[in-house]
Regions:
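Active-site neighborhoods and metal-handling regions in enzymes and metal-associated proteins
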Residues: 1-129
Length: 129
Protein backbone atom coordinates (compact mmCIF):
# COMPACT_ATOMS: atom_id res chain seq x y z
CA UNK A 1 0.00 0.00 0.00
CA UNK A 2 1.14 3.55 -0.71
CA UNK A 3 0.13 6.05 1.96
CA UNK A 4 0.44 9.80 1.48
CA UNK A 5 0.47 12.01 4.56
CA UNK A 6 -0.35 15.64 3.78
CA UNK A 7 0.19 18.05 6.67
CA UNK A 8 -0.98 21.66 6.67
CA UNK A 9 -0.38 24.23 9.37
CA UNK A 10 -1.42 27.80 10.11
CA UNK A 11 1.12 29.46 12.41
CA UNK A 12 1.52 33.13 13.28
CA UNK A 13 -0.59 34.20 10.33
CA UNK A 14 1.05 32.00 7.68
CA UNK A 15 0.07 28.73 6.05
CA UNK A 16 2.42 25.82 5.45
CA UNK A 17 1.88 22.56 3.60
CA UNK A 18 3.99 19.44 3.16
CA UNK A 19 3.44 15.92 1.98
CA UNK A 20 5.33 12.64 2.17
CA UNK A 21 4.64 9.19 0.73
CA UNK A 22 5.31 5.94 2.56
CA UNK A 23 5.36 2.33 1.42
CA UNK A 24 3.40 0.23 3.90
CA UNK A 25 3.57 -3.57 3.85
CA UNK A 26 4.15 -5.37 0.58
CA UNK A 27 4.27 -3.01 -2.39
CA UNK A 28 4.73 -4.37 -5.90
CA UNK A 29 7.52 -3.09 -8.14
CA UNK A 30 5.11 -0.91 -10.13
CA UNK A 31 4.11 0.86 -6.91
CA UNK A 32 7.73 1.31 -5.85
CA UNK A 33 8.56 2.69 -9.31
CA UNK A 34 5.65 5.16 -9.10
CA UNK A 35 6.78 6.46 -5.70
CA UNK A 36 10.39 6.79 -6.89
CA UNK A 37 9.30 8.58 -10.08
CA UNK A 38 7.16 10.99 -8.05
CA UNK A 39 10.10 11.74 -5.75
CA UNK A 40 12.49 12.27 -8.68
CA UNK A 41 10.03 14.49 -10.57
CA UNK A 42 9.29 16.59 -7.47
CA UNK A 43 13.02 17.15 -6.89
CA UNK A 44 13.58 18.10 -10.54
CA UNK A 45 10.74 20.63 -10.32
CA UNK A 46 12.25 22.12 -7.15
CA UNK A 47 15.71 22.25 -8.77
CA UNK A 48 14.22 24.25 -11.67
CA UNK A 49 12.96 26.96 -9.29
CA UNK A 50 15.31 29.96 -9.34
CA UNK A 51 14.81 33.72 -9.53
CA UNK A 52 14.26 34.90 -13.10
CA UNK A 53 12.62 31.72 -14.37
CA UNK A 54 8.97 31.59 -15.45
CA UNK A 55 6.58 29.73 -13.17
CA UNK A 56 5.14 28.04 -16.27
CA UNK A 57 8.46 26.23 -16.79
CA UNK A 58 7.79 24.03 -13.76
CA UNK A 59 5.04 22.30 -15.73
CA UNK A 60 7.43 21.62 -18.60
CA UNK A 61 9.92 19.94 -16.27
CA UNK A 62 7.20 17.79 -14.74
CA UNK A 63 5.60 16.89 -18.10
CA UNK A 64 8.89 15.86 -19.68
CA UNK A 65 9.77 13.48 -16.85
CA UNK A 66 6.23 12.12 -16.53
CA UNK A 67 6.16 11.34 -20.26
CA UNK A 68 9.63 9.74 -20.19
CA UNK A 69 8.49 7.34 -17.47
CA UNK A 70 5.09 6.53 -18.97
CA UNK A 71 2.97 8.23 -16.31
CA UNK A 72 0.51 11.13 -16.39
CA UNK A 73 -0.60 14.13 -14.37
CA UNK A 74 -4.09 15.41 -13.69
CA UNK A 75 -4.36 18.60 -15.72
CA UNK A 76 -6.76 20.39 -13.38
CA UNK A 77 -4.58 19.95 -10.26
CA UNK A 78 -1.96 22.60 -9.71
CA UNK A 79 0.61 24.03 -7.35
CA UNK A 80 0.10 27.47 -5.90
CA UNK A 81 1.51 30.34 -3.97
CA UNK A 82 1.18 29.98 -0.21
CA UNK A 83 1.59 32.36 2.71
CA UNK A 84 -1.04 34.47 4.43
CA UNK A 85 -3.52 32.79 2.07
CA UNK A 86 -3.42 29.01 1.59
CA UNK A 87 -4.16 28.98 -2.16
CA UNK A 88 -2.74 32.09 -3.80
CA UNK A 89 -1.25 33.25 -7.08
CA UNK A 90 0.68 32.09 -8.93
CA UNK A 91 -1.18 28.90 -9.77
CA UNK A 92 1.32 26.47 -11.30
CA UNK A 93 0.12 23.84 -13.77
CA UNK A 94 1.86 20.46 -13.67
CA UNK A 95 2.00 20.01 -17.42
CA UNK A 96 3.68 21.87 -20.26
CA UNK A 97 1.94 25.20 -20.80
CA UNK A 98 2.52 28.78 -21.88
CA UNK A 99 0.46 30.45 -19.16
CA UNK A 100 2.02 33.81 -18.32
CA UNK A 101 1.76 33.61 -14.54
CA UNK A 102 4.90 35.51 -13.70
CA UNK A 103 8.61 35.18 -13.12
CA UNK A 104 10.13 33.73 -9.97
CA UNK A 105 11.78 36.11 -7.53
CA UNK A 106 13.31 35.87 -4.08
CA UNK A 107 10.63 35.94 -1.38
CA UNK A 108 7.36 34.43 -2.62
CA UNK A 109 6.61 30.91 -1.38
CA UNK A 110 5.34 28.17 -3.65
CA UNK A 111 3.61 24.85 -3.02
CA UNK A 112 4.70 22.54 -5.85
CA UNK A 113 2.06 19.86 -5.46
CA UNK A 114 2.80 17.67 -8.46
CA UNK A 115 0.81 14.48 -8.71
CA UNK A 116 2.10 11.57 -10.77
CA UNK A 117 -0.42 8.93 -11.83
CA UNK A 118 -0.44 5.57 -13.58
CA UNK A 119 -3.72 6.35 -15.37
CA UNK A 120 -4.37 8.65 -18.28
CA UNK A 121 -4.82 11.70 -16.07
CA UNK A 122 -8.59 12.00 -16.48
CA UNK A 123 -10.76 12.01 -13.38
CA UNK A 124 -13.69 9.62 -13.33
CA UNK A 125 -17.15 10.47 -12.02
CA UNK A 126 -16.30 8.80 -8.69
CA UNK A 127 -13.13 10.88 -8.34
CA UNK A 128 -10.75 8.01 -9.13
CA UNK A 129 -7.97 8.40 -11.66
Amino acid sequence: MIVNVDVTVFYRGYHGDCSEMFLVGEVDQAGKDLVQATYDIFNAAIAYCKPGRPYSGIGGVIQEMVDERGYSTISNFCGHGIGKTFHANPYVLHHKNDVNNGIMAVGPKLDVAGQVDRGDGRRQANGAV
